[in-house]
Amino acid sequence: NTISLREDPEAVNRKIRTMPTDPARVRRTDPGEPGRCPVWQLHEIYSGEDVKAWVQQGCTTAGIGCIECKQPVIDAVLKELAPIQERAQAYTQDPDTVKNIIADGCEKARDLARETMRDVRESMGLYYG
C-alpha cells in the first residue's frame, strides 16, 4: 500500500486507519506489542518520544485502541504532506510553467548529449568538424 505525495487527506486517513496492526491483538482489551505492529514503524519515523512512550504504554496495557494509536501518525503524515501539496498546487494551476520547465530541461539535455557525442566521435577519430 502506498500514500502518494498528492493524496487527499480523506484517503490518507482511510489508508492509515485500515492498516493492519499487531496480529496478536484481536480485541481492544488484549494487550499488544508495538514491535509487531506495522503502525509502530510509522511512529518511529513521525512521532516524538512523548507520543512513542504513550503508544508503548497504551498498547502494552490495552489502555488505547489501535485507532487511537493511529491518529498521531495520520496527523503527522498530513502535516508533512501539506507543504508538498501546496507547492504542487502552483504547478497544477499553471500547466504552461510545467511545459516550459520540461522544454528547458530537454534543451539542456540535447546540448549535453551533443557535446558528449562530439567527444565520443573525436576519441574514435570520427570527428571531422
Features from the language model and the residues they span:
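Conserved nucleotide- and phosphate/pyrophosphate-binding catalytic cores
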Residues: N1-G129
